[in-house]
Every structure is written in structure tokens, then in C-alpha cells.
């Protein structure tokens, strides 16, 4: 046993140039852990609270000095003296100290920074990798990357409504080859876009962000890039989408306004559109296909295509076991997106993954659009054998940091490493 002797937070920058929280944890034996907290652009209304200062004269109101102060002046006093390996105890103490259902008092960004830094310090204390500390001898499955190579919605300044169009190299023999395939497709996509005279600037997550005639044109363009890179769509590479539908849902009219296309759809019309798209294109995963509060629409979507396509709840479930439990009971979706900062502690994150697995739901470990060099989610993906990771295009250091960490983990696991490819979608009809 080694106790925590120091907890220190500071304000640093994320990949969008906005402030975020960095926390360091030290133990009496000299162990050390550091964690940086990510931040989202499109956020679910039920997410844990990210505490911002609100001072418009400083970082346009997005400073996090209050959260930093909460770590240094309040949380540190509570956590110092804890056994660094008592992750559940540490997280429980912070939740109780905050005392709100959404971590609104101290801030999920303050609490999460301490939670993740403590886990890293514990791994350092024991002389093991983070994935080994969290997953033990069983953590050995490298995730299929869900690579966002074409951006729209809140992640880009263009006229594409759907937020993310992704490729999944399901036919790769291992993670290393999957990453290579994704990178080659990204380069092929750039050439396709240039050939069409389209913009090759990138969005928040490293994918290209051109103006296109329709959301379907995005799918067609990616299909061409896959072929140009020398791969077979549907066999070696499948497509995935994050609609982030809450961003274009009009709650007053109850309709979906796809302004880029100049189209308005009802829930049922959205479901029909998705059904058409999965028939025409090798789409294996759709995230947030409907608004987070449109549970009737989600139920219909699940009934119509849930046996053929992974239906991921992000804003729908916000990594929250209460929301997930309700979804499981009602037969809504069949997968959950896992974002550590949506819930605010490592313990609650692992609980959500475990609940999903027990119910036959898949779990996709995810970054946020505002990221840092922190690669914790790569270790979480392997530790939990989640089988999937969503962490942007294979470009920009904030995204590549996670991919490079997975390469290191695969090397370290050597012959024990597994890559499940198509078998990742175990809850779908083959």
C-alpha cells in the first residue's frame, strides 16, 4: 500500500485552443500519474457538468480556473491519504464531496482529472502499464478503429449535416494493419476531394470537411476513396456514421431539419432514410441516429435495422448507467458510446461498459472533439476488451497519440494480442 501525498491541477490547452484541466497525483513511494481532460462540441443535455469560469474577458469565458481551484483546494484535501490503488474509494469520495447528481458543484472536469491521474499513479506504483492495471491478464483485445475521415455538423464549418463519416477496417489481421489501411484511405480521400476541386481543410477530429451536395455524396466519396486505396468496401472496410441528430432536431416541430440538403424529416422518415442507406452502402454502425429524447423514434429504428447495424447511443445514454439501464429495458439501440468525461469518473465509466456487455450491447470507447495528448482511452479500450475505439482520423497529434499508444500495447502483448474485426459485432445477424 502506498498513499497519495500530493494532488495538483493546472489549466492547459486542448486541441481546439480552449482551456482544460490537467491533474498530477503523487504517492509516498514516488509514483506519479498525470491526466488531461477532454471536452466535447456536441454535448448531450444529460452529461455531467463541465465547469467553466464564464469570464468573457478570459478565454472567451471558457477558462477552467474554478475547476483547477476545486482540485487544489477541495478535492486534494479529501484524496490525500488514500491508498492510490483504491480507485473505487477515491471516486466514491469525490462523488460524495460534490454531492450533486451531475457533478455540477466541483465539475466533472475536476473530478475526472483526479480519477484518471490516480489510476495512472497506481499503475506506476505497481510497475505495470495502465491497460494491465485496469484489465489484468484478460485485457488483450485491440479495438477496431472507427476512423472519422469526413467531418460535418458541429465538427466542421461546412454544409454537411451528419457530423461524422467513418471507416472501420474490419478485414485487417491486426490493429497495426487496420491503422495502415485507415491512413491510406485518408490519403486516397484527399486525392478524390482534390480531383473534384473540393476543400481539403480538416475538422476538429482530423477528417476532411468539404462542402458536398448531400450527406449521401459523403458516403459515395468515401466509397471511392476505399476503392482507390486498393480495398474492398463491405469486405475489408465498412462504413460508420455519427449523425449527432440532436444538433439538427427541432424540438418545437418534432422534426429533423437537414439544412445542408434543405430537407425536413419526421422520425419515421429518418428511419426510412437510414434503412435506404444501409441497403445501398456497407454501413455497420450508426450513432445517435435520432434525437436523445426521441425514444419512440429510437425504438422504431432499433426494430427496423437493429439486427443488421450497430446502433450506438451517445447523447442518448451519456455513459450513464441509469440512462443505459432504461434503454436496455425498453429495447433501445444495441450499443453505447463510452466517453469518460460524460460521467466524470473512471469507476462509473467501467460500470457502464460492464452493464452494456452483460446486456449484450457493444461498447465503443470514444474521444471528444476537444482532445489532448492524453492516451488513457487507448488503455481503457484494451483493458475492457471493448473491441472498438473512436478517436478521429489518423492525423493530428491529439488523435494519433491514441493510435500510437495502441501500437505500443499491441507490441507489448505480442502473441497474446487479439483483433476481432467483423466478430466485434457479435450481437448482429451475420
Swiss-Prot record:
Q: Which cofactor does it need?
A: Mg(2+)
Write the Enzyme Commission number(s) for this entry. 4.2.1.11
GO MF annotations in UniProt: magnesium ion binding; phosphopyruvate hydratase activity
SMART domains noted in UniProt: Enolase_C, Enolase_N
One matching Pfam family is: Enolase_C
Any GO BP annotation: glycolytic process
GO cellular component terms, semicolon-separated: cell surface; extracellular region; phosphopyruvate hydratase complex
Name the chemical reaction catalysed here: (2R)-2-phosphoglycerate = phosphoenolpyruvate + H2O
Q: Does the keyword Metal-binding apply?
A: yes
* InterPro entries on file: Enolase, Enolase-like_C_sf, Enolase-like_N, Enolase_C, Enolase_CS, Enolase_N
UniProt-annotated location(s): Cytoplasm; Secreted; Cell surface
**Which PROSITE patterns does the entry link to?**
ENOLASE
Where along the sequence do coiled-coil regions lie? Answer: none
Q: In which pathway does it act?
A: Carbohydrate degradation; glycolysis; pyruvate from D-glyceraldehyde 3-phosphate: step 4/5
Q: What does this protein do?
A: Catalyzes the reversible conversion of 2-phosphoglycerate (2-PG) into phosphoenolpyruvate (PEP). It is essential for the degradation of carbohydrates via glycolysis.
Which family, according to the similarity comment?
Belongs to the enolase family.
Q: What is this protein called?
A: Enolase
